Amino acid sequence: MHSRQQEIAVALHVCAPFTGPESVQTEIERRIRFIQSCLRESGMKTLVLGISGGVDSTTAGLLAQRAVEGMRAAGEGDHYRFIAVRLPYQVQHDEHEAQLAVDTIKPDECHTVNIGTAVLGLAAATEALEPLSPEQRDFVLGNTKARMRMVAQYTIANARQGLVIGTDHAAEAVMGFFTKFGDGACDLTPLAGLVKDQVRQIAAALGAPEQLVHKVPTADLEELSPGKPDEAAHGVSYRNIDDFLQGKPVPDEAAQIIVDTYDKTAHKRQLPKEP
C-alpha cells in the first residue's frame, strides 16, 4: 500500500466499496435525496446536464430524472424538471450511443446545442493561437470545447431557473481529468466520491444498457487523437485507480503515476487563490 493512499482517499471523500445489490440501491437513494435537497435549498426549478453517451453522464442523468420525478410524485410541484443537453462539436462520432443514453434516461426535455460554430469563431478571433504547433492548438481547443459546453449548459440553466450537474467522480478527480472551468464547473456533483466501477454498478442498477455501462471512457476533445481512451491519457488503468482509492494493493509504478498526477493537478481541485 502506498503511503499516501489513505490521505488521498479521505481528501476525495471516497465512498466505501459496495457489498452487494442492497448497498448499491442504498447509495442510489442517498444520492437522489442529495439532488433533491440541492434543488429545494437553492429554490431552483430545473436540473441541466450535458449528455455525451458515456457512463458518467448517463448515470448522473438517470439519477437526476428520478430525483425530479420523485419530487413531482410527492406533490412538491410539477415545475421540477430535468433538461438533458446534447452538445456535439460539429459531427459526433458516437452519435448512436449519445442518443441511446437520452433514450435510456427519458429526460423531461432534451435540447441540442452544436458548439462547433462558437469554438471555431473564438479560435479565429484569438491571435494567441497563431504561433502554436498543430498539437498545441488541438489541446487548447479541446479545453475550449469543454468550456463552451459548460457555457451552453449555464445559458440554459440561467433561462430556466436551473442548476447545472457535473459528472466528476473520485477516479477522475484524483487524476485531475477535467477541464478547469469547463466540465469541472457545475453546481452539484452527484457522483462525487465514487470510483469508476461504482459508477458502472449504479448505472447497471438503474437500467442502463450494457453497451453504455462498459463503454470505453474517452473525453474525445482532441481532433488529432479522436476517441483517445481516458486510460491512454492517464497512463494507468481505471482498475488501478479504483484499487488505489479503495486502499487495495496497486503496482508501484501505477501508484506513483497516480500520486504524481494528483499533486500536479492540485490547482484544479482548489478555489481561486487569494492574497
Swiss-Prot record:
Mg(2+) binds at D56, E172. Its EC number is 6.3.1.5. It is an enzyme of class 6 (ligase). The keyword GTP-binding does not apply. GO terms for biological process: NAD biosynthetic process. Pfam families: NAD_synthase (PF02540). Coiled coil: none annotated. It catalyses: deamido-NAD(+) + NH4(+) + ATP = AMP + diphosphate + NAD(+) + H(+). Keywords: ATP-binding, Ligase, Magnesium, Metal-binding, NAD, Nucleotide-binding. Belongs to the NAD synthetase family. This is NH(3)-dependent NAD(+) synthetase. The gene is nadE.
